[in-house]
Amino acid sequence: LFTDDGNGVQDPQLMRRAYEYASDLGVTMAQHCEVESLTAGAVMHEGSCCSHLGLPGWPSLAEELMVHRDIELVRLTGASAHFLHLSTAGSVGLVRAAKADGLPVTAEATPHHISLTDELLASYSALYKVNPPLRTIEDVMAVREGLRDGTIDAIATDHAPHVSETKEMPLDQAP
């Protein structure tokens, strides 16, 4: 298993080459799916809650574009991919379709992405600021369904410890 977790590989050509090598070696690539140019400065999920709070949003598309790109690279190279901490209904649908096509892909979700929504950030507490961000109830329900139907293969904590001072910072300044 090869990964650069925490930082999705932004360059499609570099990722293509990585998948080609992984295919030759019989190694699975694990990908944190985030198009960083779409998430720069984002604090929480882009939706009605972030609009109401006046905070910069993180679009679902930032995850879904990279999931789509990597599925197509798997199709091209014959490599296998594991998608880390899926959080959107769209991503679950993409992985479900890839599996139906017989592609060698797996995925995981976190406990918080199957149980918590972006509405918790109305408290302005940085305790709920995670990467990828908490999403809508519709996304939570889609991730749960993906777990039930086998689209999502595992639950993983994606534990990223922070000192308490960083979680006590204002939401827009916390990591």
Segment roles from a protein language model:
Residues 1-6, 173-175:
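Short intrinsically disordered, low-complexity coil segments enriched in acidic
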Residues 3-155:
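Histidine/acidic residue-rich metal-binding segments in metalloenzymes
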Residues 158:
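Short acidic-hydrophobic catalytic motif
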Residues 164-175:
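Conserved nucleotide- and phosphate/pyrophosphate-binding catalytic cores
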